[in-house]
Amino acid sequence: MKLKLMFIACFTLLLVGCTGSEIKIKPENFLLDQRFNESYSSIGLLDASTGKNLPSVGNLTEAFSHEIRASRVAKDVYYPARPDDKTDVTFESNFNSELDTHSGSAFAKSFLTGFTFFILEPIFWYDFDYKFSGTVDVLKDGKVIKQSSAVTDVTLSVKWLSLGDVSKLESEAISQGKKSLFNQLLRDVHK
C-alpha cells in the first residue's frame, strides 16, 4: 500500500511539469496596431515570389495586402495590380517561408522519453522553427525608388504531452510571424 501511494505521489509530481507550450518571435511585433497616415493615396501590389512557401502559411502577398489596408499606409490597395490601375507606387513583393521540425532530435527525445518511462519528459522541448523572409521594391514609373527586406524567426516549442496542441498553436505562431514581418516591411517603405 505504501509503495502504491509513493508511486502515485511521484507520478503526480512528474505530471505537473509535463505539459507546456510557448511561441517566441524575433523580432517581436514592435509596431503592433500602429497606424500610418496614408503615406500613399494608392498602391498596386505585385507578387514576384519565386521561393519556397509552406501551404499552411498561405499566400503571403495577399496577406500583405490586407495588412497594408489595415495599417492605412495607402487609401487604396490594388492586389493583384493590373496595368490599367492608377497608382502612386507599385510594391513588388517576394516572400518565402520555411519550416524546420528538427526531426532527428525529436526522434532522439521521444526515444529517451519512452526509454526512461517518461521520467525525463519534463526536460525535453520539441521545437518547430519557422522562418519568414520578404523583400519589397517600391516602384514609381517602373523604376525602383526604395527597397526593403525583413526576416522573422518564429519558434514554437511544446513538451511531449502537448504535441497534440501543435496544430492549434501553429496558426497562432504563423499569424504572429507574418504580422512581425509585415510590420518591419511597412515601417521601412512608408514615406
Provide a role label for each language-model segment.
Residues T19, I23-P27, L31, F124-K191:
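C-terminal/domain-edge helix-coil "capping" segments
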Residues D84-I145:
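Surface-exposed short loop/turn segments
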Residues I43-L45, F64, I68, V89-S93, ...:
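Hydrophobic beta-strand residues in large extracellular and virion-surface proteins
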Residues E62-H66, S110-F117, S157, S167-L169:
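Short, low-complexity, polar/charged sequence segments that are solvent-exposed and flexible
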Residues G17-P83, V151, V189-K191:
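A structural "domain/chain start" motif
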Residues M1-T19:
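Sec-dependent bacterial lipoprotein signal peptides
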Residues K2-L3, G104, A108, V166, ...:
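Structural motif marking the loop-to-transmembrane transition
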